[in-house]
Amino acid sequence: MTNNTLEARLHRIGGPLRMLRAAPGGAYPFPMRAEFTNWRDEQEAWKSTAILFDQSFHMTDVGFRGPDTGRLLSALGTNSFRTFGRNKAKQFIACDAQGRLIGDAILFGLEDDRASLVGSPTVPDWVAYHAETGGYDVEVIRDERSLANPGRRALYRYQLQGPRAQAIVEKAHGGPIDRIKFFAIGDFTLAGHRVRALNHTMTGAPGDEMTGLELFGPAEDGPAVLDVLLAAGEEFGMRQGGAIAYSTTALESGWLGLPVPAVYTGESTRGFREWLGADGYLSAASLAGSYSAEHIEDYYVTPYDLGYRNMVRFDHDFIGRQALEELQDRTHRRKVWLRWNDEDVTRLLAGGLFGGELRTKYLAVPYAVYATFQYDAVLAGGAQVGFSNRTGYTVNAGGWFSLAVVDEEHARDGAEVTVVWGEPGGTRDGVERHVQTEVRATVSTSPLA
């Protein structure tokens, strides 16, 4: 084992909890303009008309090409791959040998022997590691996110989201386009360039008819495609969205995208840790919040905890299959939305600014996540029953809320819980001195906007 690996770094620092709690980094970065108009109107646009986000910078894109592409993906993904191929897409789920979630990413079927994984670096790196070390006849093609890539990206990505998304694309195209099924990929021309588009949604209910299209193509075509979309969108009141609004989209859709990945411990992931560099994403990631446990494994989740049961298919062999089969009929935690009490939120906002010696942890508006992995304790009757993850405000919900994972008995509409806001002790310069406080919250098992 060399010294320049994640595994070596963990040994030097004294384990994953110490490393993550001391890391100075904040929330996952979106290197784009903060606002184009203002984040409130930008949030409202994805419900009332449409919004266009430029996703060309913040996500890692790793491609796989060759005769073993399908075999590689099937060996690592919990999803079924029986019908996967060209112009198909999936929310790819990867687990360790104990059935604990490593992460998810969007899998694009570009050709029958070519696919790409797009998202935060964890899952693309996990699959690339196996492609390079597992004896697969696969070429790995990396297009790093902008923070790790001083050059130009290979592709542009534009997310067009909202009820007028299809009308805007058709106006830009100059006529009707063929219907693209949910989580399928279609193509058409814009500004004389071939554009491919995935039908999925970042807000609202997944499966809505073409209310969300992720358009992508060669980077050199991006400016012309963007111009024609902006021109077409004027008639419909479309807005461009900035990083502030973008950070809140998952709150409405319910995508809990950044739990601690189950890669920091265990023999089944040791090779991966020894393959990763000591200065990469998982080495620099940070952990914050009031949820405090003795072992990093207490922060891990399973696909069942996040509602991904329908993405776990036992029609093929994959890493974690045996564990997930054994776990499937047990009681699991559940993902829920927590609507924070308006009075308590108002008190928090004031306390973070005017609290003096009793200052509370600053509640950044509209998105108050201050680490890569945000874990705040959820209590019921004084006992810890789960953790709150992403938290923030959207005008569409009309209040402050968070995504959470709680014990099943508390995952019922109207259940009352409290969220502990603030950390038990400052460990990072980026977190100000403050006192912890409790916020009342109400459980909802369905989206709040």
Model-derived segments and spans:
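Conserved, structured C-terminal
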Residues: 1-25, 34, 111-449
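Acidic, proline/glycine-enriched N-terminal capping motif
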Residues: 1-91, 100, 335
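Short, charge-rich binding segments
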Residues: 83-85, 94-100, 105-111, 149-150
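Charge-dense polyanion-binding interfaces
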Residues: 84-95, 99, 185-193
